[in-house]
């Protein structure tokens, strides 16, 4: 007999209206269409030839991660008796895996055909990859000598027999497999050689001047395979590569007693290498019996084995870019681009002083990250700076930012770093940086169980006399010097006291493990972000129902949250125009009659990765938020994310204009149809091609040049307005219309409480000079006494930290 609770749950299900799948689609299939869109760039003949080859490599890398994480996780769920059902497509886990495997052959065939086409064209131009079946006598001699001198001493050929069982093939590693003809009448055996990852995979071959020839390490071994197995003769040969499930939950594994979280993550990373295989890739020709032996050892079905005739793992492509002959570089590569100075920031003055005067908005990769890096470096040596706090998700291997944090800690400042060790595939790098930061004296914490910290926030606190001043830095992308040159992102630098108070509360809550803080300006997931989005949509719905103009703009990487999707559909039905630019997954299908007719979805894939997240509400975008979060359930409900308002009129104008530039793109943009497929944006008659990324590149150079000219001393120079960062649709339209709109903040649903006392606006401050950022770890000559006082010895620093810990434990205060 069912219990009372079960009866109530059953009754609730009956009352709940059936879910509508007419305007939604499966996220896995939507993702595959996105990756196919990436592959489109390899087919685009307006893209330089070698850059097209890089897009093939990016497509493959994306697909690898998708198979490891998404298909790996679904494969686990497919083993359950009662499988969960996708709330966008009504498909079970096994049905989703089936659908993905059905799509795979077509994608891989398309990849192989364009790879061969591009390589053939590169070959004619003088960039040549040697194949073992077409080696010249000179090349074969070189390969044989190279193998004997460098490769043969390193490899360990293995014959699989009862005394030598099938080994655990490492995830992503390359192996050479072959059937072997034994010296007796016994059945053929299996031979395996792991391609050594410790050696350079690209082996340069002597070639005529002005050309570049190379052979891959695995092909060197293939060419000399007959000498690898002694008396055994290879019957067939191929390269194989296993992709294993990497969808492992660090928090679900349990931290062992007396094990800190860093050690726990190291153990998890080792375990990932041994998880269940998802697919097997084969390049070459193997006898059916040989392939069957491998497949059975891996416990893979036939549908999970994919064969091709091109190299496995195209990651080597990026490594040969620097080897391209100089006279071919202009033809084969994008024109080199250097991120430009932000025209509103004077890099010869204190960055802190300028942010106190006016909010600053950085726009990567078109503008350099240097103002942020220099500000943190300044703070590390500024005697008035008392603390630096930051969240880090993905960190560059060579990080100026982390070096500055280390300097700050060594200079006696309070440095708190939330290092997210669960950033997938960056765990090892983050572990290494966490250890270095901790050794330098930083307080390193690792976030909350079950909730990755994906927010991008940094706060610098200064004491000027008895007053505290806070600078808050918030980004849509990682504090990562490498990706800041490749990903399109925003960073806001502000001294706004309200945002500063919220940020201070945010860091305090993180230290206490509290995810339910109340914030006045910031929308913080997992509690406050989705309600902020819903309130913004509800406001526009009410405007539309009242007969007023209503509009919403979203710029995202992905949209999968069913509640948000349903609210967008509700807005569409109410008459709200919804424009979205979504680079990756869109589980919402626009243009469905009676459901999403007023929704328009575009995607832009080009030279740079579109990564910024923008939420804008209102016809004049009077509410603009930038965010670290996509509208995916994992971001809105299961991560620590931050959406932050853009309140400064100049910064708001830049974001508003950026939205318009993106919507004008008719070269790299694609439009999503009501059946879930992407199609090129059609140009109107007489409309000129407009590539938004190229426009922003050119504009960054123009702005930097204008700012440089404006900064030069000129006799009796007339006062000029700040340079306008954007196109001027009409003469003298120096200031975009949005600057005249009063900024609005979505108020949180808080119980009535006394208004906080008004805080005075911070005034510009004169600060002591900090060492130039290019000095990196070098300490400035002639340190001030104030800095010397901030540099206690190891014993004194240790006693100070113990005292601070006891004070915090007793009073709950950190100051």
PLM feature spans:
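N-terminal localization/anchoring segments of enzymes in phospholipid and broader phosphate metabolism
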Residues: 2-552, 570, 574, 586-815
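Active-site glycine- and acidic-residue-rich loops that bind
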Residues: 562
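Hydrophobic alpha/beta core scaffold segments
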Residues: 577-581
């Amino acid at each position: 007999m069912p219990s009372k609770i079960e009866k109530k749950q059953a009754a609730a299900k009956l009352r709940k209206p059936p879910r509508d799948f007419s305007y939604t689609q499966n996220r896995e299939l939507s993702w595959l269409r996105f990756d196919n869109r990436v592959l489109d760039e390899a087919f685009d003949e307006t893209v330089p030839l070698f850059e097209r080859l890089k897009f093939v490599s990016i497509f493959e890398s994306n697909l690898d991660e998708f198979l490891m994480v998404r298909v790996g996780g679904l494969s686990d769920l497919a083993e359950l008796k009662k499988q969960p059902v996708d709330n966008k497509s009504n498909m079970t886990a096994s049905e989703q895996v089936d659908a993905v495997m059905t799509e795979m052959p077509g994608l891989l065939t398309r990849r192989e055909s364009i790879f061969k086409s591009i390589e053939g064209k590169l070959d004619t131009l003088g960039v040549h990859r040697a194949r073992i079946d077409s080696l010249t006598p000179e090349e074969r001699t070189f390969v044989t000598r190279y193998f004997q001198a460098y490769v043969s001493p390193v490899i360990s050929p293995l014959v699989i027999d009862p005394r030598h069982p099938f080994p655990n093939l490492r995830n992503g590693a390359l192996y050479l497999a072959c059937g072997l003809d034994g010296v007796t009448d016994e059945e053929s055996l299996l031979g395996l050689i792991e391609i050594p990852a410790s050696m350079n995979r690209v082996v340069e071959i002597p070639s005529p001047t002005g050309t570049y020839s190379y052979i891959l390490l695995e092909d060197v071994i293939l060419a000399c395979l007959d000498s690898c197995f002694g008396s055994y003769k290879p019957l067939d040969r191929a390269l194989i590569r296993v992709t294993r499930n990497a969808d492992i939950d660090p928090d679900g594994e349990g931290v062992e007693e007396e094990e800190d979280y860093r050690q726990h993550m190291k153990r998890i990373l080792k375990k990932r290498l041994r998880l269940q295989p998802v697919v097997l890739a084969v390049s070459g020709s193997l006898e059916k019996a040989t392939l069957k032996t491998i497949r059975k050892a891996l416990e893979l079905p036939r549908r999970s084995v994919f064969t091709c005739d091109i190299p496995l793992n195209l990651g080597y492509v990026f490594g040969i870019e620097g080897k391209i002959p100089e006279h071919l570089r202009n033809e084969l590569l994008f024109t080199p681009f250097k991120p430009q100075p932000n025209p509103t920031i004077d890099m010869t003055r204190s960055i802190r002083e300028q942010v106190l005067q006016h909010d600053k908005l950085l726009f990567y990769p078109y503008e350099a990250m240097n103002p942020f890096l220099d500000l943190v470096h300044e703070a590390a040596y500024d005697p008035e700076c008392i603390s630096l706090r930051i969240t880090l998700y993905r960190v560059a291997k060579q990080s100026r930012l982390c070096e500055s944090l280390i300097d700050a800690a060594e200079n006696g400042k309070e440095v708190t770093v939330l290092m997210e060790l669960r950033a997938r595939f960056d765990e090892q790098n983050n572990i290494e940086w966490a250890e270095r930061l901790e050794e330098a004296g930083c307080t390193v914490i690792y976030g909350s169980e079950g909730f990755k910290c994906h927010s991008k926030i940094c706060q610098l606190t200064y004491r000027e006399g008895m007053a505290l001043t806070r600078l808050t830095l918030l980004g849509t992308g990682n504090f990562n010097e490498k990706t800041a040159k490749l990903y399109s992102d925003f960073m806001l630098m502000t001294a706004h006291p309200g945002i500063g108070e919220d940020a201070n509360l945010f860091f305090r809550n993180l230290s206490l493990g509290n995810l339910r803080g109340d914030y006045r300006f910031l929308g913080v997931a997992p509690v406050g972000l989705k309600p902020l989005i819903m309130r913004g949509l509800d406001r526009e719905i009410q405007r539309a129902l009242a007969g007023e103009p209503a509009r919403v703009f979203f710029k995202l990487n992905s949209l999968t949250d069913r509640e948000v999707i349903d609210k967008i559909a509700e807005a569409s039905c109410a008459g709200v125009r919804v424009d979205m630019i979504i680079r990756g997954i869109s589980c919402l299908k626009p243009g469905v009659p009676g459901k999403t007719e007023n929704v328009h979805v575009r995607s832009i894939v080009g030279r740079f990765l579109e990564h910024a997240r923008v939420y804008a509400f209102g016809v004049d975008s009077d509410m603009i938020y930038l965010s670290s979060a996509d509208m995916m359930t994992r971001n809105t409900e299961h991560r620590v994310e931050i959406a932050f308002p853009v309140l400064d009129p100049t910064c708001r104008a830049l974001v508003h204009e950026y939205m318009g530039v993106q919507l004008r793109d008719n070269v790299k943009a694609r439009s999503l149809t009501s059946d879930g497929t992407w199609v090129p944006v059609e140009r109107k008659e007489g409309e000129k091609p407009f590539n938004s990324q190229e426009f922003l590149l050119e504009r960054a150079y123009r702005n930097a040049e204008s700012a440089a000219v404006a900064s030069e001393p000129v006799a009796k120079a007339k006062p000029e307005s700040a340079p306008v960062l954007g196109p001027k649709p009409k003469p003298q339209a120096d200031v975009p219309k949005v600057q005249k709109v009063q900024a609005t903040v979505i108020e949180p649903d808080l119980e009535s409480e006394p208004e906080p006392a008004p805080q005075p606006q911070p005034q510009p401050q004169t600060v002591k000079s900090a060492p130039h950022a290019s000095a990196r770890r070098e300490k400035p000559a002639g340190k001030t006494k104030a800095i010397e006082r901030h540099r206690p010895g190891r014993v004194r620093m240790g006693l100070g930290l113990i005292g601070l810990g006891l004070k915090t434990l007793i009073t709950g205060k950190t100051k």
